[in-house]
């Protein structure tokens, strides 16, 4: 490993190390928001609601592809960081090689299984009439690019795992920039419409994956793309998938709960959907910053779990303090200028009032959400597969019974408060799990919970 990477893992001041790993990830998560709206933005110029609907309907499929990537990227990434902390550099080559080619194989399976049924999958997603063919065509490009999409997720995670978060950010930035260039050319220049939007995203993922491959081939002695090293054993599979499977479940279940929430909101009409949509966009930015902070330090926690548990404890404390500062700043902003923030999106006073209320509720849950992110990342980093699995399931399903109960008791207001209640339950569960596993973590995590 390079001396600079070792410096941030082992010797730099804790806050400096935290920012080194987290800042690129924060920027990367914000870029993912831009990435998600680019296609709809450009397609919007065509003023065809069917095309916009087609792209929106494919979001669950992208979430599934991301979840499939998580099988390898989160599990193998945290395992590699732990191996580096234990100075076992040779084993990390075998882990990375297996994960890279395992991810490619998974993508090829997606092509074989899903591509022939693109029309049927589009119908299951809700596409009807003119939207059906458009959605199916978009899906076909997505499925064909699946190996590269999954590979992109894996390699981006590996860059952070070995202590090169700036490379991770550069790869994501290059992908988004290329997408911005390609979308108008393919959509308008070649008159490909929805297919052009899909191709722009696919080509961007291919280019980013190639960027990471070239980087690792030239600069890394701990990540290998040599297929001859892709030889898994029982220990390797256990270490990868005991964390990868919970990460996969979390992605799938979170998408499912989002669908359930939408169904409850739809019961109250466009007024409720619009109000929640505005508040969601506003709270998404601090939430993604906190998510980037928590996910960014996962390699740092994993590395020091094997080499310096006192430093690991200091990193966790620094992250908790940072989450607290972000939370306080956001709460002050929401309770002082929340109306004006919502007013940037609509002039309908009824929606402004409801969206402002929802914004206050969802922002109140930001602190608990952050604790949940951090402790889930901590369980992943330290290889606590059972705890990570429990958290993945809880974060995906707890909100569902809460939604039913609160909706029955308090209507739309209850639906909104259910978000805070569910986050509170998940945060308490995360703290309890970490407390129960404190001996395995071999650091006094009870201090972190008790203050």
UniProtKB/Swiss-Prot annotation:
Q: Which UniProt keywords apply?
A: Antibiotic resistance, Cell membrane, Membrane, Transmembrane, Transmembrane helix, Transport
Q: Subcellular location, in the record's words? A: Cell membrane
* GO molecular function annotations of the record: antiporter activity; xenobiotic transmembrane transporter activity
Q: Which domain of life does the UniProt lineage start with?
A: Bacteria
Q: How does it sit in the membrane?
A: Multi-pass membrane protein
**The keyword Ribonucleoprotein is assigned to this record:** no
Q: Which InterPro entries does the annotation name? A: MATE_fam, MATE_MepA-like, MATE_MepA_subfamily, MdtK-like
The question of whether Nucleus is a record keyword is answered with no
Q: Name one GO cellular component term.
A: plasma membrane
Q: Where are the transmembrane segments?
A: 26-46, 52-72, 97-117, 139-159, 170-190, 194-214, 245-265, 282-302, 318-338, 355-375, 390-410, 417-437
Gene Ontology BP, a term: response to antibiotic
PANTHER family documented for this protein = MULTIDRUG EXPORT PROTEIN MEPA, SPORULATION PROTEIN YKVU
What function does the entry list? Multidrug resistance efflux protein.
| UniProt similarity note | Belongs to the multi antimicrobial extrusion (MATE) (TC 2.A.66.1) family. MepA subfamily.
State the protein's name.
Multidrug export protein MepA
Query: Which species expresses this protein natively?
Result: Staphylococcus aureus (strain bovine RF122 / ET3-1)
Q: Which gene encodes it?
A: mepA
């Amino acid at each position: 490993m390079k001396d600079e990477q070792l410096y941030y893992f082992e010797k730099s001041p804790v806050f400096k190390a935290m920012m080194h790993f987290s800042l690129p990830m924060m920027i990367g998560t914000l870029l993912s928001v831009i990435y998600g709206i680019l296609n709809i933005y450009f397609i919007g110029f065509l003023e065809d609601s069917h095309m916009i609907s087609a792209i929106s309907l494919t979001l669950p499929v992208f979430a599934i592809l991301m979840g499939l990537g998580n099988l390898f990227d989160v599990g193998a990434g945290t395992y590699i960081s732990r191996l580096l902390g234990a100075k076992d550099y040779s084993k990390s080559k075998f882990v990375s090689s297996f994960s890279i080619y395992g991810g490619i194989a998974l993508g090829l399976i997606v092509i074989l299984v899903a591509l022939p049924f693109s029309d049927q999958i589009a119908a299951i997603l809700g596409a009807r009439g003119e939207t059906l063919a458009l959605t199916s065509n978009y899906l076909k490009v997505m499925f064909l690019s699946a190996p590269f999409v999954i590979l992109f997720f894996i390699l981006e995670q590996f860059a952070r795992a070995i202590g090169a978060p700036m490379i991770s950010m550069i790869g994501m930035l290059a992908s988004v920039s290329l997408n911005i260039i390609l979308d108008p050319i393919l959509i308008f220049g070649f008159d490909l419409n929805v297919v052009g939007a899909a191709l722009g995203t696919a080509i961007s993922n291919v280019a980013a994956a190639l960027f990471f491959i070239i980087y690792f081939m030239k600069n890394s002695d701990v990540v290998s793309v040599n297929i001859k090293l892709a030889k898994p054993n029982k220990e390797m599979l256990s270490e990868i998938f005991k964390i990868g499977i919970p990460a996969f479940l979390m992605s799938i279940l979170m998408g499912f709960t989002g669908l359930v929430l939408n169904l409850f909101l739809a019961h109250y009409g466009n007024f409720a959907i619009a109000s929640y949509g505005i508040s969601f966009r506003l709270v998404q930015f601090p939430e993604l910053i906190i998510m980037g902070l928590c996910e960014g330090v996962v390699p740092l926690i994993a590395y020091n779990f094997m080499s310096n548990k006192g430093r690991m404890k200091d990193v966790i404390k620094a992250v908790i303090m940072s989450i607290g500062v972000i939370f306080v700043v956001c709460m002050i902003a929401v309770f002082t200028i929340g109306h004006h923030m919502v007013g940037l999106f609509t002039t309908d006073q009824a929606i402004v009032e409801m969206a402002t209320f929802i914004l206050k509720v969802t922002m109140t849950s930001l602190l608990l959400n952050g604790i949940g992110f951090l402790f889930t990342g901590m369980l992943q980093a330290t290889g606590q597969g059972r705890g990570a699995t429990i958290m993945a399931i809880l974060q995906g399903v707890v909100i569902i019974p809460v939604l039913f109960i609160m909706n029955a008791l308090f209507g739309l207001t209850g639906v909104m408060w259910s978000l805070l209640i569910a986050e509170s339950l998940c945060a308490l569960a995360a703290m309890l799990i970490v407390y129960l596993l404190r001996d395995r973590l071999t650091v006094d995590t009870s201090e972190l919970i008790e203050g």
